[in-house]
Curated annotation (Swiss-Prot):
Organism: Escherichia coli (strain K12)
Location relative to the cell: Cell inner membrane
The keyword Cell membrane belongs to this UniProt entry's keyword annotation: yes
Keywords from the named record: Cell inner membrane, Cell membrane, Membrane, Sugar transport, Transmembrane, Transmembrane helix, Transport
Protein name: Inner membrane ABC transporter permease protein YjfF
Membrane topology: Multi-pass membrane protein
A biological-process GO annotation: hexose import across plasma membrane
Length: 331
């Protein structure tokens, strides 16, 4: 139990130490307003990262999620602005489309035995291209429901305002934790990530599980696209460029092994929080370039990947170490 939770404990420790350092430099970090702003600003990333956690836990990768955000935004902007469709109808419509696209990619991955990297890369280019066909310019979204959702928030002690977007992200994390650790689907994801051949021998349908994994990933990416469109009040074909890498970084920093089979959704939440903490510190400082966020995340990735490799080698050595047998008769 301890060895499997060690990456999570290290991630939480890094976040706590980082937060304490920020607090010593800028006492304003003690305000709940800062925490709420981190949740709101990173709500779409957190939602995507939950879906990416399941993908990486299964030993796969999903590079299409950034393009899903872009397509979701321009699609909503078009159908709401040009066709007068209510967001209450447009949201479920685009969610169904996103889930169907993920299911299709999952089917191709399992049926054709092509690496997920290739299939989702194709999906990334396809959706980005379709987004450009819809519109090359940013399309503003003007609708009362969007205005209501973007301003909806609840006051909490300390001067903070927990937005509906931040609350939705936390709800997705809670549901993700439940799915991963309290359902048959979660057990199947861990089993496939640990050893797909053994999972097959156990009677687990890898095709059905793979389809559901990628359907969940693109479904949550579509939900993140909805959140992002509410956050920006617009749809843009260039939205979400590089977000897939931020999501992967959050998952890895959160302690999920890239080889699959080990990791937690809770760790991913802290991975997202660490990225948000670094960005907020840079904003507070005012003298540092925003690119320092990428540099810091890159350093953390190097550290956590090296840590993952070290832990993996340690576990393999322990499992392969010979068992000392004691001859009772000789005693």
């Amino acid at each position: 139990m301890i060895k499997r939770n060690l990456p999570l404990m290290i991630t939480i420790g890094v976040f706590v130490l980082g937060y304490l350092y920020c607090l010593t430099q800028f006492p304003g970090f003690a305000s709940t307003r800062v925490i709420c702003n981190i949740l709101t600003d990173n709500a779409f990333l957190g939602i995507i990262a939950v879906g990416m956690t399941f993908v990486i836990l299964s030993g796969g990768i999903d590079l299409s999620v950034g393009s899903v955000i872009a397509f979701t935004g321009v699609f909503l902007a078009k159908v709401i602005g040009d066709f007068g469709l209510s967001p209450l109808l447009a949201f479920p419509l685009v969610l169904v489309m996103g889930c169907a696209f993920g299911a299709f990619m999952g089917l191709l991955i399992d049926a054709l035995k092509i690496p997920a990297f290739i299939i989702t890369l194709a999906g990334m280019f396809f959706l980005r291209g379709v987004s450009y066909l819809v519109s090359e310019e940013s399309i503003p979204i003007n609708h009362p429901i969007y205005d209501t959702l973007s301003s909806l928030a609840w006051k909490i002690p300390g001067g903070g305002r927990l937005s509906a977007m931040g609350l939705l992200m936390l709800a997705v994390v809670v549901i993700g934790i439940f799915l991963a650790h309290r359902t048959r689907f979660g057990n199947q994801v861990y089993a496939i990530g640990g050893n797909a051949t053994s999972a097959n021998l156990m009677g687990i349908s890898t095709r059905s599980t793979t389809i559901r994994i990628y359907m969940l990933s693109t479904g949550l990416a579509t939900l993140a696209g909805i959140v992002f469109s509410i956050y920006t009040q617009a749809g843009y074909a260039l939205a979400g460029v590089g977000v897939e890498l931020d999501a992967i970084a959050s998952v890895v920093i959160g302690g999920t092994l890239l080889s699959g089979g080990v990791g937690t959704v809770l760790g991913t939440l802290f991975g997202v929080a660490i990225q948000g903490l670094i960005q907020t510190y840079i904003n507070f400082d005012g003298t540092l370039s925003s690119w320092w966020t990428k540099i810091a995340i890159g350093i953390l990735l190097f550290i956590f990947i090296a840590l993952q490799r070290g832990l993996t080698v340690l576990w393999e050595n322990r499992q392969s170490s010979p068992v000392t047998r004691v001859n009772i008769a000789q005693q």
